[in-house]
Amino acid sequence: MIFRILLSVAFLSASSAIADPSKIAFWNTQRKGANQQNAQHRPEWYVAARELGLDYVRILPDAWPAEGRDFLIGNADNFEAINETDLSLLIEALDEAERNGIKVVLTMVSLPGARWKQLNNDRDDARLWKDKKYHLQAFEFWRQLAARLKTHPAIVAYNPLNEPHPDKAFGFDAPDEKFAQWFKRIQNTPADLNQFNREMVKAIRSVDAHTPIILDGWFYASPRAFEYNRPVDDDKVLYAFHNPGPWQMVTYRVNQGRYAYPDRVPKSWNGPTESWTIDRLAQQMHAVQKFSEQYNIPAHRIIASEFWYDRRLEGAAAYMADLIEIYNQRNWHWAFYAFRGTGTWTGLDYEIPPGQKMGWRYWQAIEQGKDPEPLKPRGPNPLWEILQRQFERK
């Protein structure tokens, strides 16, 4: 047993010695990418990503076929060790990304004690924020994963947890005054996301000194909650925010034709509308800018790692164009959501023209258990061209 422990320590030390210290240099200039959150690994995806010209992809692999209950984790109820079969599939995808010149941000939607809602019978799993034993399991999961992936050339960042929301677990929907009072009371408790992020960075750094780490903040990485985020003492950390919304405007099933950017933006959940300019949209990220200035976080350590607007809704092209302009003006990294998503959720597949519906052959293929991807009517359209232009090589 002692021999095995010493051998393991020696292996980790040797691996650390050959880990790539230059990975942070990737982020020293603005990077533009896309999200990939599919139900399986598809090698042809990376070929298409190369042809588009993506700098990087943010992969969320939780829905990939898992040997156990939860991909890579095994069982989010009680993590013990990385599942080797799942890890082999992930490495296969990373190899494919590298062959096509696409760098990878690896993101988990599930962690021990925080199983992704869509894989949990549509129930939010908040155990991570109420019991520190799950913190320890989450840290151990990422220690093991980082030790195995730190030398892979495709990996340019770990994003340990997508859209954390301990706030919601305790009944908060917005960073209001009641939340501010609660925030003060929960310091150094399991609900303290900032402490969780600090300890997560420390855990990863115990096995991997060099790979950048991207941290999501409160309220599903909301830009408006950035005043409650705290920086970590690590010069290879980036701070992420997601879609500025308003959510009820950009979401198809909620919008129902009521709202459109920039002329009919909701002032409240079901309230009246108002017109926005690009400057008004930029105000949604004011707390991000203030965080950057207050803590001396340079622009190349800020990342808008998800933004979207359902293609079927009026205003999608104007919204996406204005957000990209805002991010580019500030030299923030960004990744649109999403590129060539598989399955029947096609509202965020911008290569499909805004008014285009899926044909009968598409639905027939799904009914027959066949691959419907070749039947998606992707093609040139004004919305897609807004994104496509961003990846043209100068």
What is the predicted function of each stretch?
Residues 1-8:
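Sec-dependent signal peptide recognition
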Residues 14-15:
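N-terminal signal peptide c-region/cleavage motif recognized by signal peptidases
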Residues 65-85, 112-132, 169-182, 347-354:
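Surface-exposed, active-site-proximal loop segments in enzymatic domains
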Residues 118, 126-274, 283-310, 329-335:
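Active-site region of glycoside hydrolase catalytic domains
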Residues 314-394:
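Aromatic-rich peripheral "rim/lid" segments of glycoside hydrolase catalytic domains that contact
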